[in-house]
Amino acid sequence: MDDETAAIVIDNGSGMCKAGFAGDDAPRAVFPSLIGRPRHHGIIVGMGQKDSYVGDEAQSKRGVLSLHYPIEHGIVNNWDDMEKIWHHTYFNELRVASEEHPVLLTEAPINPKSNREKMTQIMFETFNVPAFYVSIQAVLSLYASGRTTGIVLDSGDGVTHVVPIYEGFSMPHAIARMDLAGRDLTEYLVRILAERGHSFTTSAEHEIVRDIKERLCYVALDFEQELETAAKSSSIEKSYELPDGQVIAIGNERFRAPEALFQPSLLGIEQGGIHETTFNSIQKCDVDVRKDLYGNIVMSGGTTLYPGIADRLHKELVNLSPSSMKIKTIAPPERKYSVWIGGSILASLSTFQQMWISKQEYDESGPSIVHRKCF
């Protein structure tokens, strides 16, 4: 497929937007899904100040902006801002006309139906796309890993979900979703850093904490053991330089923040950790397929990038599951973008071409057609 006619794949994450052309092996544009609005009035005339900034530009000017993520927990809470992000994707990042390319969007499972309908409506009515499809993120991650059977643990910035898939069929009754993901871990890290006397309050300072989290955090294989080690020696302490040059030391916070994935009670969330959620999801599946699911636990999304997370998940599942069960956790190196890569594979398949919702079908049936044609 050439760029003239190739479908466009946009993976709208709560934290990052990944966009590019179907058939490519990586997204061309990756930028934070955020909108920044000035906190102060501009006084220098003729500087061409805008009333809002998108993505990297908002990130670089964050010192004077208040930042807002339009997607929270995988659900769009501000459609005007969402439109700005899509506009930015088409016209500034990919530099293509939206009416010339079919578009594939992604979504978290168990999302409100209205979210899909509105997405469909904006794409057809505002951007005039010729064809449209929306796909479940975890399913795409499985495509990207080259499997048709497996259970995908996809954890991004806004949503963590577990989707079991057998021979290409998803099992909707066993899908589990947790609204506990990267952004909650960032908030938690903000809180435990405050105990050390480092206060991060503004939306811009939260971005600094997110960077600390991405660079320094890891998952402990044995949490209690690691806490003892941390108390005895300073071997796990790392220093981090803040943008103003001040250096702060980060100790047991490095593994305390991601621990919330396995112990959501740390955040006051009454729910099992990702290991229990995965286990429960497998238990809801038919007894004949469980063995295949245990042997293909595929991780995807940015929140699965912590060092040590695959080993810890493996250990926890071994403790939960029957003793004879062979458990394999697969953490592909490109898992940060595997949803996008799966979308790129799907949209370039010849068999997929009859699956698109065309403009004509949309005009006949309205936004509700998305529930019939996309599952």
Swiss-Prot record:
The keyword Endoplasmic reticulum does not apply. Pfam families: Actin. It comes from the Eukaryota. GO terms for molecular function: ATP binding; hydrolase activity. Disulfide bonds: none annotated. Signal peptide: none annotated. Keywords: ATP-binding, Cytoplasm, Cytoskeleton, Hydrolase, Nucleotide-binding. InterPro entries: Actin (IPR004000), Actin/actin-like_CS (IPR020902), Actin_CS (IPR004001), ATPase_NBD (IPR043129). Actins are highly conserved proteins that are involved in various types of cell motility and are ubiquitously expressed in all eukaryotic cells. This is Actin.
